[in-house]
C-alpha cells in the first residue's frame, strides 16, 4: 500500500498540464492506485515516466504501447472510464 508522501508525489506527477491526461490520471491515482498490488503500482509509476504525447495517443486509442506493462496500465485506466 502506498504511503501518503508517495501518493502526494504521484498526484503531482499525474497532473500533466494536458486536460485529457489530467482527467484520467489524477482520479486514478487518488481512487485506484492505493488499492493496486505492488506490480501494478510499479507499472503506473513507469507510465508516468512516458512522454505526454505518447500517453495522449494511447488514451485516445490511436495506438498502444509496445511495452506489455504499459499496455496493461493503459487498458486498466481506460476500462475504468469506459465500462462495457
From Swiss-Prot:
Record gene name: sdhE
UniProt protein name: FAD assembly factor SdhE
Domain of life: Bacteria
Location (main, coarse): cytoplasm
Protein role: An FAD assembly protein, which accelerates covalent attachment of the cofactor into other proteins. Plays an essential role in the assembly of succinate dehydrogenase (SDH, respiratory complex II), an enzyme complex that is a component of both the tricarboxylic acid cycle and the electron transport chain, and which couples the oxidation of succinate to fumarate with the reduction of ubiquinone (coenzyme Q) to ubiquinol. Required for flavinylation (covalent attachment of FAD) of the flavoprotein subunit SdhA of SDH and other flavinylated proteins as well.
Similarity comment: family membership: Belongs to the SdhE FAD assembly factor family.
GO biological process: succinate metabolic process
Gene3D superfamilies assigned: Flavinator of succinate dehydrogenase (1.10.150.250)
Stored InterPro entries: SDH, SDH_sf, SdhE_FAD_assembly_factor
Location(s), subcellular: Cytoplasm
Keyword match Chaperone: yes
Keywords recorded for this protein, A-Z: Chaperone, Cytoplasm
One Pfam family it belongs to: Sdh5
Annotated GO CC locations: cytoplasm
Coiled-coil ranges from the UniProt annotation: none
Amino acid at each position: 500500500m502506498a504511503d501518503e508522501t508517495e501518493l502526494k508525489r504521484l498526484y503531482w506527477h499525474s497532473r500533466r498540464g494536458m486536460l485529457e491526461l489530467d482527467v484520467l490520471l489524477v482520479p486514478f491515482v487518488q481512487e485506484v492506485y492505493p488499492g493496486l498490488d505492488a506490480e501494478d503500482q510499479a507499472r503506473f509509476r513507469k507510465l508516468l515516466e512516458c512522454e505526454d504525447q505518447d500517453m495522449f495517443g494511447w488514451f485516445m486509442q490511436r495506438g498502444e504501447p509496445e511495452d506489455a506493462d504499459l499496455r496493461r496500465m493503459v487498458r486498466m485506466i481506460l476500462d475504468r472510464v469506459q465500462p462495457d
